Amino acid sequence: MPTSPTMTSVPIARSPRPSYQQINQHQPSDSALGLVSTRSFPAIVGTADMMLKSSQVTLVGYEKIGSGYCTAVVRGKVADVRLAVEEGARTAEQFGQLVSKLVIPRPMPNLQAVFPIGSHLVELAQQQRGYSRLSNRSIGLLETRGFPAMVGAADAMLKSADVQLASYEIIGDGLCTAIVRGTVANVAMAIEVGMQEAERIGELHAVMIIPRLLEDLEHTLPVATYWLDENEPLPMLLPNQVREKQRQLVALPELEKAVVPQRQAKPLPLQEKTEAPLVLEKEAEKPIVEVLGPEID
């Protein structure tokens, strides 16, 4: 079992305030507003369940003003709202918790802009809350006057049957309500044991068991955040960057520089200078004697 879960309730959404155009879009010409008030949280939940199952109306939510006063707000056509309010008031009278009832045909847009009674607020509340893992199960509510009596009753209920503590609700005037979920048989057994424990510790104020919840009632009941599966955004699919493996350079051994014999260029042979024979000056001065032979005829 979870320890010390964070408890949250789903009250009637109060912000943002809608404009007149948005209100007129959600408001049919024959719409009506119905309110039934009790002085017990289990009683108002049972009253709202009867109102939803008796006619085609939409449960906007609950308005808790303190001192134990709770009001269920429904919307729908005029005839459906009148029937739902009458059935809800009759149920609250059976519990001995009815305070007042009201039907308003065709409420003005200004009324919806100020009070949290617009049917479009149901959509806002559903968007802010995720899916509960305790949905589609029976519900049991046990209300005590005083916090210790409620905690002791909740502990006894969890130990006596296979149920889960969904949440708790405080409405003022010392009234606290423990909410358990499970099968019909387990919830009935848990509530019976919890009643005995609450009377032993303090004051038992009211109890309620609802075997089957409608969707509108399911969305308006408080539930701990531990049991909620919040819608998470899908991860963005981005291409994976493939990193190329860097090649490691292999260090080569230093090779000794081989001495390569270089051919020495031979000097080109110089051209031999032919010196002309020197002629002595004396020899040059001598006349050249030409010897002529005898002429032969």
Curated annotation (Swiss-Prot):
It is found in: Carboxysome. The lineage of its organism: Bacteria, Bacillati, Cyanobacteriota, Cyanophyceae, Synechococcales. Has 2 BMC domains, is thought to trimerize giving a hexamer that may interact with CcmK proteins in the carboxysome shell. Residues 1-29 are annotated as: Disordered. It comes from Synechocystis sp. (strain ATCC 27184 / PCC 6803 / Kazusa). Residues 18-29 have a biased composition (Polar residues). Belongs to the bacterial microcompartments protein family. Its main location: other. The keyword Repeat applies. This is Carboxysome assembly protein CcmO. GO terms for biological process: carbon fixation; photosynthesis. Keywords: Bacterial microcompartment, Carbon dioxide fixation, Carboxysome, Photosynthesis, Repeat. Required for formation of the carboxysome, a polyhedral inclusion where RuBisCO (ribulose bisphosphate carboxylase, rbcL-rbcS) is sequestered. Required for recruitment of major shell protein CcmK2 to the pre-carboxysome. Suggested to be a carboxysome shell protein. Residues 32-116, 138-222 form the BMC domain. The gene is ccmO. Homooligomerizes, possibly as a trimer, interacts with CcmK in the carboxysome. InterPro entries: Bact_microcomp_CS, BMC_dom, BMC_shell, CcmK-like_sf, CcmK/CsoS1_BMC. SUPFAM superfamilies: CcmK-like. One of its GO terms (molecular function) is structural constituent of carboxysome shell. One of its GO terms (cellular component) is carboxysome.
